[in-house]
Regions:
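Flexible glycine-rich, low-complexity coil/linker segments exposed to the extracellular/periplasmic environment
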Residues: 114-121, 125-159
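Outer-membrane beta-barrel pore domains
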Residues: 30-34, 38, 58, 175-337
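Residues that flank catalytic or metal-binding motifs in active/ligand-binding sites
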Residues: 26-28, 43, 59, 83-85, ...
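Outer membrane beta-barrel
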Residues: 1-120, 169-176, 249-252, 258-264, ...
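Short Gly/Pro-enriched turn/cap motifs at secondary-structure boundaries
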Residues: 76-80, 156-158, 196-198
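Short C-terminal domain-edge/linker segments immediately following a structured domain
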Residues: 46, 75-83, 134-138, 187, ...
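Loop-centered beta-sheet repeat module
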Residues: 142-188
Length: 337
């Protein structure tokens, strides 16, 4: 639902159905947005529940991937653990054939961001976090299980502290745009309820998009940061993990549709208690996808995805091979009105 109250004031309410989740039908996003009139310098703002402006793959009123079925590792994680209740403002100035923009926001919620990334690791899928949804965790080590629930609710707010993010954009005179974002949920690391504790999760995200001729577009993102929980001890934090991921995506109009190829790289580095709880991981993935329009409101997708990763805790906690690889071929029909 996208009500347009005036030229300057609009809204969006998005509800999604995802079979097999803790809430099959739930609120996706809901916010009011404002934009100033046409001018060289413009201001816009929004307030409500939404994803921060991180992904270059997602868009539209339902925050879906535009050129494939499965997003990158970077944006799969953003989709499942980085949703906020926020007030966001953006100031943009155009000069000549280029522009600069600064976006800043203060938010609450998203206290549990980092739990999945630490205890499960990276994943590639199209499941998105909704307001009331929770995700199951894999089997935990004996040292962690007494202090962590078997599920995580990433959107919860348990410490009452506000976080922030800020983003800088430059649209160059050439068909190239770049952006840099800093995110910090400012979790206090000790507040909690129902065996879920506020995590301190901070990261940088750098993105770029370029047109390579009339029919080809390249997109890339690099995300790196740290997440930790619990009090500092002489032996380190109970959980303290550095993480990083990147992808390069090339899309070309082909045969009346669009062909996309993407390569992903991702890793985590555990900084504490590795002997008892080794959350190190490294892996990569490759994807080929073809999107073909059937009508002006329906598209069909075919996607081939291969993922390989090495994570020691799979063997230690779940008796699964630490080194895993999967190949998936899937199709999807997407209808929009």
């Amino acid at each position: 639902w996208k009500p347009q109250f005036t030229f300057n004031l609009a809204g969006l309410v998005s509800v999604t159905h995802q079979a097999g989740q803790s809430k099959d039908i739930d609120l996706n996003e809901a916010f009011l947005s404002f934009r100033s009139g046409p001018a060289a310098t413009r201001f816009s703002a929004r307030a409500g529940v939404f994803w921060p402006p991180i992904s270059l793959e997602h868009g539209g009123s339902t925050w879906q991937v535009s050129d494939s079925i499965t997003p990158s590792a970077v944006n799969s994680w953003v989709g499942e653990e980085v949703k906020v209740l926020a007030f966001e403002g953006k100031l943009e100035h155009r000069f000549g054939d280029q522009s600069l923009a600064l976006t800043a926001a203060v938010f609450e919620h998203d206290d549990m961001a980092g739990t999945l990334l630490t205890y499960r690791g990276w994943a590639l899928h199209d499941v998105r976090l909704t307001v009331g949804n929770h995700f199951p965790l894999p089997p935990l080590s004996a040292s962690k299980a007494p202090y962590q629930a078997p599920v995580t609710n990433p959107f919860w707010d348990v410490d009452g502290r506000a976080g922030y993010y800020a983003r800088f954009d430059w649209r160059s005179p050439w068909p190239v745009s770049v952006n840099l974002l800093r995110y910090d949920n400012r979790g206090d690391q000790v507040s909690g309820r129902q065996l879920q504790t506020a995590w301190r999760t901070r990261f940088w995200n750098a993105g770029a998009m370029a047109s390579l001729g009339q029919r080809t577009v390249a997109k890339a993102q690099v995300l790196w940061g740290n997440t930790l929980v619990g009090p500092d001890t002489p032996f380190g934090y109970p959980a303290d993990v550095d993480f990083a991921a990147a992808y390069l995506l090339l899309s070309r109009e082909f045969g009346g549709g669009k062909l996309s190829a993407r390569g992903d790289w991702f890793k985590t580095h555990d900084n504490s208690f590795v002997a008892n709880d080794n959350n190190n991981e490294h892996g990569w993935s490759g994807m080929l996808a073809y999107k073909h329009p059937l009508t002006h409101f329906a598209d069909v997708f075919v996607e081939l995805l291969h993922v390989e990763s090495d994570r020691p805790m799979r063997l230690a906690n779940a008796a699964l091979p630490a080194m895993q690889n999967q190949t998936q071929l899937q199709t999807a029909l997407r209808v929009g009105f």
